[in-house]
């Protein structure tokens, strides 16, 4: 065993080369001297007494600083001999790099340089140091700010999260967690070099986010080996999967790379195309990563983490949100509608400045019924579903103008797919953005047939933008099930649509 220089202290540790072996702490309080042998350590005390501490013959380092976390051998690689330094494929300790909370293993075929993990003939070069830097930033945000884990009460108090770089050119990016070969739980993720460098590190942060989601159940689950009763380890409404993992992982990653949230040319564009769908629709799962900012503004920076930790078996996120915040269905609809109205101008803490160049970019989803009378209606391809929404850019009126929208919710229009007509509901209102960046929010209406209106103020300059916002707001919630590989319309309760017709006064869609 190697021995580090001793400092004046009362304890030393053994850090084994086999990182799956728990570190050993040895008391040297009041010692005059110590003697180290191959498999034992003798501590000599002032009164001529001697304490002998048995050590294993395993290779390791005796050190005077706490080595911190070690590793749990994952069942995923139960047959892998990580101590085999002559391995010609797979993983071993010789091809790994550690930080405080994470370890990166790369396939031995990549070679021994942690800064050049490259598949032959491929231009993507991963760097284990960079991976660890991103991962540690994730730890700081996901634990310290978002509250996914509670230090001192987590499996990560003992075990590092494991990240692997498999030997392949084709895209691979996945993460969650697994059981240890002898019990326990560990977070585990994989990304090949292409994925490791993709999106400026966003993919790493996304996959690391999945390990934290898994570890919620590992820390809090009570149902035995699977720990499937916490942290959304289930589907709902008859499905076996859920897209909330992806929605939150992308949102988590944007907390690490906030400058990408409205500029990366990917998820925001998908969001604009898909947000008429059910909030929990599988087709929207990767791009539904913006409502979380509103919920955190309303209930605190750690609210999404608390949702993951406080959800109960079988609940979907809407049910968890309603229960946690002691709301009824109508109140939930009102809160969600407020968030969507704020999204018209991105009037949300944390994104307000970064998203300002995106104001006015929502898609027009209304077709003209009568130009002269300014009557418009939805179309089946993009009609709102439960908790989906439209934000329509409207012609800007002069200050002092009263704009009106005579709204009619439809439950018998041809070409639409109706589910639970008796639960049909809508929310609708105007939002104005003034020249001095003041936001003016109109009264939200919920009547199947009613009129929303807004007076454009005269004391904030001209009106820069006017929007009409409509949300699908069922009077009673039902879950949207999904199983990977099955189309959403496999379930009869899915693909609900809430069409509407609206006639405007003093403005029109543009």
Specify the residue positions occupied by each region the protein language model found.
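Zinc-dependent metallopeptidase catalytic helix centered on the HExxH motif
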Residues: 186-261, 287
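Active-site-proximal alpha-helical
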Residues: 269-349
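Surface-exposed patches in mature extracellular/periplasmic domains of secreted proteins
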Residues: 143-161, 220-227, 238-242, 262-268, ...
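Bacterial Sec-dependent N-terminal signal peptides
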Residues: 1-11
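Compositionally biased alpha-helical segments
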Residues: 9-72
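Second-shell loop/turn segments in exported
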Residues: 118-130, 191-199, 233-239, 274-282, ...
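Beta/coil-rich, acidic/histidine-enriched accessory regions frequently appended to metallopeptidases
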Residues: 314-510
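Zn2+-dependent metallopeptidase catalytic core
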Residues: 70-102, 106-186, 192-208, 212-222, ...
């Amino acid at each position: 065993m190697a021995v580090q220089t001793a400092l004046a202290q009362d304890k030393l540790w053994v850090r084994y080369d086999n990182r799956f072996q728990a570190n050993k702490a040895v008391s040297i309080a009041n010692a005059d001297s110590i003697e180290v042998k191959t498999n034992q350590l003798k501590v000599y005390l002032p009164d001529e007494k001697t304490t002998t501490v048995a050590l294993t013959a395993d290779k390791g380092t005796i050190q005077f600083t706490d080595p911190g976390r070690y590793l749990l051998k994952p069942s995923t690689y139960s047959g892998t001999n990580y101590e085999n330094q002559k391995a010609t494929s797979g993983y071993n300790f010789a091809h790994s790099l550690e930080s405080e909370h994470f370890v990166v293993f790369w396939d031995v075929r990549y070679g021994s340089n942690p800064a050049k993990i490259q598949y032959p003939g491929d231009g993507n070069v991963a760097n284990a140091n960079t991976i660890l830097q991103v991962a540690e930033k994730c730890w700081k945000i996901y634990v310290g700010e978002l509250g996914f884990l509670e230090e001192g009460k987590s499996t990560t108090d003992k075990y590092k999260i494991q990240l692997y770089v498999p030997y392949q050119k084709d895209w691979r990016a996945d993460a969650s967690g697994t059981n240890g070969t002898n019990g326990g739980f560990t977070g585990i993720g994989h990304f090949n070099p292409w994925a490791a460098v993709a999106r400026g590190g966003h993919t790493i942060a996304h996959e690391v986010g999945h390990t934290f989601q898994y570890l919620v159940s590992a820390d809090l689950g009570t149902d035995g080996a699977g720990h499937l009763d916490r942290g959304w380890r289930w589907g709902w409404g008859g499905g076996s999967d859920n897209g909330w993992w992806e929605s939150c992982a992308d949102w988590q990653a944007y907390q690490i790379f906030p400058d990408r949230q409205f500029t990366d040319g990917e998820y925001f564009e998908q969001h604009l195309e898909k947000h008429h769908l059910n909030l929990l629709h599988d087709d929207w799962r990767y791009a539904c990563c913006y409502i979380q900012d509103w919920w955190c503004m309303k209930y605190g920076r750690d609210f999404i983490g608390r949702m993951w930790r406080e959800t109960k078996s079988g609940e979907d996120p809407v049910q968890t949100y309603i229960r946690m915040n002691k709301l009824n269905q109508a109140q939930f609809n009102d809160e969600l509608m407020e968030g969507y109205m704020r999204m018209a101008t991105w009037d949300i803490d944390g994104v307000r400045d970064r998203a300002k160049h995106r104001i006015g970019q929502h898609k027009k989803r209304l077709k003209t019924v009568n130009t002269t009378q300014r009557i418009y209606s939805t179309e089946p391809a993009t009609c709102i579903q439960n908790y989906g929404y439209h934000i329509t850019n409207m012609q800007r009126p002069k200050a002092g103008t009263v704009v009106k929208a005579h709204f009619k919710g439809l439950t018998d229009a041809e070409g639409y797919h109706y589910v639970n007509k008796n639960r049909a509901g809508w929310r609708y209102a105007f939002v104005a953005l003034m020249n001095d960046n003041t936001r003016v929010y109109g009264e939200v209406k919920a009547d199947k047939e009613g009129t929303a209106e807004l007076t454009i103020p005269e004391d904030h300059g001209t009106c820069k933008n006017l929007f009409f916002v409509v949300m699908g707001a069922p009077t009673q919630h039902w879950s949207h099930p999904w199983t990977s590989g099955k189309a959403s319309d496999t379930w009869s309760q899915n693909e609900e649509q809430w069409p509407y017709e609206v006639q405007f006064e003093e403005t029109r869609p543009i």
